[in-house]
Amino acid sequence: MYASKLKKGDEIRIVSPATSMSILSNEAKIQAKTALERLGYRVTIAEHANECNEFDSSSIESRVHDLHAAFFDPGVKAILTTLGGFNSNQLLRYLDYEKIKRHPKILCGYSDITALCNAIYQKTGLVTYSGPHFSTFAMKKGLDYTEEYFLSCCASDDPFEIHPSSEWSDDRWFLDQENRRFYPNNGPVVIQEGYAEGTLIGGNLCTLNLLQGTEYFPETEHTILLIEDDYMSDIHMFDRDLQSLIHLPAFSHVKAILIGRFQKASNVSIDLVKAMIETKKELSGIPIIANINAGHTSPIATFPIGGTCRIEAISGTSRIWIDKH
C-alpha cells in the first residue's frame, strides 16, 4: 500500500518520535522549515514535538498522540520526523495500526526511525521511507542531492535510478554551516556480483535488530536488505549485528544487501567490509553493494521500505533502481 504522493501546497507535519525538537537551534528550525516551504509545502509542528525530558525525548503518551494526530488528520499528507535518537521502539505496541492502515500517509526518517518505518510496514503494509529528517533540511550546503531523491520517492510515482552523488561529507555541519568539508565520491563498491529484484526492507542496522523476535520485524521473503550504521558502530559491532540477522531462519530469503557509507570515526574501510563478508558463507551467491548514499553521512537518497528495488552488480560496476515507491 502506497500513500498519495506529495503535491505543491500539501501539509507536512513534523513529529518527534525519538529525540525532542527542543535540541535544535531556532536557526536550524527556521532553516529547515524555509527549505521545505521553498519546495512548495506547508509545514506544521506536532503539539508535543518540543517537549523534553531527562532523556532528551518526551513521554510515550505524547509521542503516540502526535503520531496518531498526524496520521488521522485529513489535511496532513506527509510526516517528517525531527531527528533520530534511541527510543522510538517504545511506541510500537501503542500505535493503532488498523487506523493507520485506513489513513495512509508518507512517513519519512532514518536512524532510530528505522524501528517505526519497518514496524508500520510490517503491521499495515504501508510503504514508509528511509530518508531525511526535518532537521536534515536545515543544511545550507550539500542538500541538493538529498532533496532530489526525497522528491523522486515522495512526490512522484515514476521509477528512478539512484545515482551516486559527486561528493559527500561527514562533518558536524549542524555546528558550523559555513566551513563544510566535502570529499569526492568514488561511488558504490561491488562486494559480490549478481542481479536481484525484491522488496526493500531495513535501514539502520542496530535499530532493525531491536525488532528481532517481535511481531514488528518485516518479512524477509524476496527482499533486498538495506543496512547502515553510525560512527559508534565499528567493524566488530557491524559484523556481529549483521551475523545476528543472518541467524534468523528466514534470512535465506534475502536476495541482496545494500550497505550505506560508513562514517570516518567508525574506522570501517571497504577492505574491512570485504573481509567481513568473506567470513559469511551464508551470503555466498547474493549481490552486495557497499558505500551507497544511505545513513549517517550526507547526502542521502530516500529508500521506500516495502517498495520494489532492483540492483545489478556486474564487472565491478553497479546500478540501483527503485521501481515502485
From Swiss-Prot:
InterPro entries: Carboxypeptidase_A_C_sf, Class_I_gatase-like, LdcA_N, Peptidase_S66_N, Peptidase_S66C, S66_fam. GO terms for cellular component: cytosol. Its EC number is 3.4.16.-. GO terms for molecular function: carboxypeptidase activity; serine-type peptidase activity. Keywords: Carboxypeptidase, Hydrolase, Protease, Serine protease. Gene3D superfamilies: Class I glutamine amidotransferase-like, LD-carboxypeptidase A C-terminal domain-like. The active site is at residues 111, 228, 296. One of its GO terms (biological process) is proteolysis. The keyword Protease applies. Pfam families: Peptidase_S66, Peptidase_S66C. Belongs to the peptidase S66 family. This is Putative carboxypeptidase YocD. It comes from Bacillus subtilis (strain 168).
